[in-house]
Amino acid sequence: MIDYVGVCNTVDWSKLILDIADQLPAEIGPKHKAGDPLPGLNQVTDMWAKAGYKTPDLGGTVSWDMFFPGVNFDQSVADKFAEYVGLKDINSCWISRIWPGYFAPIHWDVNDNEIELANQPDKLRWHCHIGKPEFGHVFIADDKCLYNQPQGATYQWSSRKLWHAGTNCGLTPKYILNIW
């Protein structure tokens, strides 16, 4: 389940985007490939293979950039947002960027530490639309399709493992902050 929280304006989202726009991302997704030994990964990669999804190196358009606090932007951004949503301990935080013409098909975010996480209670997750509303910036989580969201629009997820997808059929990069 996904619920609207409100508009977070404790961070200057436009300035943050300007700060990372010309940086190389810390990672380019999808990071994990079929056969990597992570619980839950094959569920995602098998589905993608069956549907014919491909990454750019194989002639496809499944790709997104990932920016991390302490690497690409100041940790205070994650801390301020965590305070806004009431998250006491940050497990993971990143900003995803999807370029025009690219997308992230249906998936849940399989984590490098999935084996350890399997022994812990599930965690809530939040995302924030940090870019201004733009034509073609679409985000789908659970049963909600989010489009033309105001800058700072924040949603809480009932699980970090919620199925979601994003696409950019617009003309400018699409940015979303994720945290759990």
Residue ranges and their predicted role:
Residues 97-99, 116-136:
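Short, conserved beta-strand element in jelly-roll/cupin
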Residues 83-108:
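A short glycine-rich, His/Asp/Glu-containing loop-to-beta-strand
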Residues 2, 122-124, 173-175:
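Residues at beta-strand starts and edge strands
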Residues 133-180:
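Catalytic core of Fe(II)/2-oxoglutarate
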Residues 1-89:
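Non-heme Fe(II)/2-oxoglutarate
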Residues 72-81, 104-115:
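Short acidic (Asp/Glu) patches
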Residues 89-90, 106-125:
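A short beta-loop-beta micro-motif enriched in histidine and acidic residues
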